[in-house]
Amino acid sequence: MSAKAQNPMRDLKIEKLVLNISVGESGDRLTRASKVLEQLSGQTPVQSKARYTVRTFGIRRNEKIAVHVTVRGPKAEEILERGLKVKEYQLRDRNFSATGNFGFGIDEHIDLGIKYDPSIGIFGMDFYVVMNRPGARVTRRKRCKGTVGNSHKTTKEDTVSWFKQKYDADVLDK
């Protein structure tokens, strides 16, 4: 045993992957975007409402303007792999947050391997990945809540190094 044993509690893992398509209007385009997310994830997406009225964009408060779906487990890793393949395994440094999460967007959903359907059209989407370590549940549970120490919290540097090592990817500076 020449190498020091790695603590399994320090391993980073993907907690969830959130796929979001923001259409900007309710109606037919929103239902078509919903079909795209359902094809991709195999789950029924949720519609998101506008927080406030923006007259210049023609958006009213509480109008449904986007759809999103949360994917966990091996399915999340598989969809993330497809999304990173579209981005050619390159992300920018500013795609990573200080808390260790990261996100990116793609322009066309058909790049993910979904067959083009003229009745649906083409939609871009955002990928948001939430990272954590084992033991993060103690801050979220209802009974006997606890805190996670600073050394165990997920940081940007941890996630960037995990991302480079797991996907053999590049993180561009600017």
Swiss-Prot record:
One of the GO biological process terms: translation
Modified sites of kind N6,N6,N6-trimethyllysine: K75
Keyword Calcium: no
Entry PTM: N-terminally acetylated by acetyltransferase NatA.
Modified residues (N-acetylserine): S2
Presence of keyword Secreted: no
Keywords attached to this entry: Acetylation, Cytoplasm, Methylation, Nucleus, Ribonucleoprotein, Ribosomal protein, RNA-binding, rRNA-binding
GO CC term, one of those recorded: cytosol
GO molecular function: RNA binding; rRNA binding; structural constituent of ribosome
Domain of life per record: Eukaryota
Subcellular location: Cytoplasm; Nucleus
Signal peptide: none
SUPFAM superfamilies referenced in this protein's UniProt entry, alphabetically: RL5-like
PROSITE patterns in the record: RIBOSOMAL_L5
Note: Present with 39000 molecules/cell in log phase SD medium.
Task performed by this protein: Component of the ribosome, a large ribonucleoprotein complex responsible for the synthesis of proteins in the cell. The small ribosomal subunit (SSU) binds messenger RNAs (mRNAs) and translates the encoded message by selecting cognate aminoacyl-transfer RNA (tRNA) molecules. The large subunit (LSU) contains the ribosomal catalytic site termed the peptidyl transferase center (PTC), which catalyzes the formation of peptide bonds, thereby polymerizing the amino acids delivered by tRNAs into a polypeptide chain.
PANTHER family, sorted: 60S RIBOSOMAL PROTEIN L11-RELATED
Quaternary assembly: Component of the large ribosomal subunit (LSU). Mature yeast ribosomes consist of a small (40S) and a large (60S) subunit. The 40S small subunit contains 1 molecule of ribosomal RNA (18S rRNA) and 33 different proteins (encoded by 57 genes). The large 60S subunit contains 3 rRNA molecules (25S, 5.8S and 5S rRNA) and 46 different proteins (encoded by 81 genes). Component of a hexameric 5S RNP precursor complex, composed of 5S RNA, RRS1, RPF2, RPL5, RPL11A/RPL11B and SYO1; this complex acts as a precursor for ribosome assembly.
NCBIfam families: PRK04219.1
Name the UniProt record assigns to this protein: Large ribosomal subunit protein uL5A
Species of provenance: Saccharomyces cerevisiae (strain ATCC 204508 / S288c) (Baker's yeast)
